[in-house]
UniProtKB/Swiss-Prot annotation:
Mod. after translation: Monoubiquitination of Lys-118 gives a specific tag for epigenetic transcriptional activation and is also prerequisite for histone H3 'Lys-4' and 'Lys-79' methylation. GlcNAcylation at Ser-110 promotes monoubiquitination of Lys-118. It fluctuates in response to extracellular glucose, and associates with transcribed genes.
Segments of this protein annotated with the region Disordered: 1-32
Entry keyword set: Chromosome, DNA-binding, Glycoprotein, Isopeptide bond, Nucleosome core, Nucleus, Ubl conjugation
InterPro entries referenced in this protein's UniProt entry, alphabetically: Histone-fold, Histone_H2A/H2B/H3, Histone_H2B, HISTONE_H2B_site
Major location (coarse): nucleus
Subcellular location: Nucleus; Chromosome
Protein's name in the database: Histone H2B
Similarity-based family: Belongs to the histone H2B family.
Annotated PANTHER family: HISTONE H2B (PTHR23428)
Quaternary structure and interacting proteins, as annotated: The nucleosome is a histone octamer containing two molecules each of H2A, H2B, H3 and H4 assembled in one H3-H4 heterotetramer and two H2A-H2B heterodimers. The octamer wraps approximately 147 bp of DNA.
Gene Ontology molecular function terms on file: DNA binding; protein heterodimerization activity; protein-containing complex binding; structural constituent of chromatin
Annotated function: Core component of nucleosome. Nucleosomes wrap and compact DNA into chromatin, limiting DNA accessibility to the cellular machineries which require DNA as a template. Histones thereby play a central role in transcription regulation, DNA repair, DNA replication and chromosomal stability. DNA accessibility is regulated via a complex set of post-translational modifications of histones, also called histone code, and nucleosome remodeling.
Positions annotated with a glycan in the UniProt record: 110
Species for this entry: Holothuria tubulosa (Tubular sea cucumber)
């Protein structure tokens, strides 16, 4: 067996950082919220062998944000018309029916109802 070369595998001394002043703090990274992990999970359920580029993910994230804002605004408007201060699942359901066309609205309402039922039974 050949002898090991000196220095190979030897641990290097840790570099010492310059001491910070008492007022200096490391800047905390701001969190960017997105729907990308959820979009990815749904995509893998529907098409397990398909990938998605970061640009396509950005477009999908913008789309989900846009639809969310439209539904929230419409639900808020409906609650205001009925002199209610709370947006309930009824307002959201009506907003979805108003915003989405035909069959898409029916599917969205049924999936939403299913999600709300699952949530209430798990509590």
């Amino acid at each position: 067996m050949a002898p090991k070369a000196p220095g190979k595998g030897a641990k290097k001394a840790a570099k010492s950082k310059a001491p910070r002043a008492p007022g200096d703090r490391k800047r905390k990274r701001t969190r960017r919220e997105s729907y990308s992990i959820y979009i990815y999970k749904v995509m893998k359920q529907v098409h397990p062998d398909t990938g998605i580029s970061s640009r396509a993910m950005s477009i999908m994230n913008s789309f989900v944000n846009d639809i969310f804002e439209r539904i929230a605004a419409e639900a808020s408007r409906l609650a205001h018309y009925n002199r209610k201060s709370t947006i309930t699942s009824r307002e959201v359901q009506t907003a979805v029916r108003l915003l989405l066309p035909g069959e898409l609205a029916k599917h969205a309402v049924s999936e939403g109802t299913k999600a709300v039922t699952k949530y209430t039974t798990s509590k």
